[in-house]
Regions:
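Sec-dependent bacterial lipoprotein signal peptides
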Residues: 1-24
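Bacterial Sec signal peptide processing site at the extreme N-terminus
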Residues: 18-42
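...with weaker cross-activation on analogous glycine-rich loops/strands in unrelated enzymes
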Residues: 36, 85-147
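Stable alpha-helical elements in mature extracytoplasmic
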Residues: 42, 46-49, 69-70, 74
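Recognition helices and adjacent regulatory flanks at domain boundaries
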Residues: 47-51, 57-58
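Catalytic cysteine-centered active-site loop
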Residues: 56-107
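Glycine- and charge-enriched low-complexity intrinsically disordered segments
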Residues: 150-161
Length: 161
């Protein structure tokens, strides 16, 4: 009889141990899974976001209409318009999704630029030729990827949806 009680107690302890280990497991990384989203829906959502934020001043670390930085604008756009949680910083955003060539850009793809020795910039492609971003000098704007500056500093593009 004591062995039955001991066996039952061991199973309970083992079960609790398994539950504890499972509860401590790290959650999956956000926006790592790439799944199709209709491009016209994404494009429409991006234009809605641009209309709402157009001209908002650039502010490093900013996350509001009082001022927003480039990765903050990307973070807020994906969260509010596309229902996706992306990392907050440009560096971490540059590590998610799948790499795409500039010729394959679609609305919603992230475009990354190396604008200085240790400086990165991110925006969101509207199509193969334009992107929306928080510019240090102009705030939230649409810029052309054909512009010499952006062509020379283009680092990579990634698809995260």
């Amino acid at each position: 009889m004591n062995s039955v009680i001991l066996s039952r107690a061991c199973r309970v302890v083992l079960g609790l141990g398994i539950l504890l280990v499972a509860a401590c497991a790290a959650p999956p990384k956000s926006a790592q899974a790439v799944h199709p989203v209709e491009t016209t829906t994404v494009e429409s959502a991006l234009y809605d976001q641009y209309q709402a934020w157009q001209g908002t001043a650039y502010r490093y670390g900013g996350m509001s209409k009082a001022g927003v930085d480039c990765s903050g604008f990307v973070y807020l756009t994906y969260r509010d318009q596309l229902g996706m949680q992306l990392p907050r910083t440009t560096l971490h955003q540059s590590r998610i999704g799948q790499a795409v060539s500039p010729q394959q850009l679609q609305a919603g793809d992230l475009v990354f630029f190396l604008t200085g020795p240790n400086t990165r910039h991110v925006g969101i492609a509207l199509d193969k030729h334009r992107f929306v971003h928080a510019s240090k000098s102009k705030g939230v704007v649409v810029s052309s990827l054909a512009n010499d500056y952006w062509q020379q500093t283009l680092w990579q593009a990634r698809r995260v949806y």
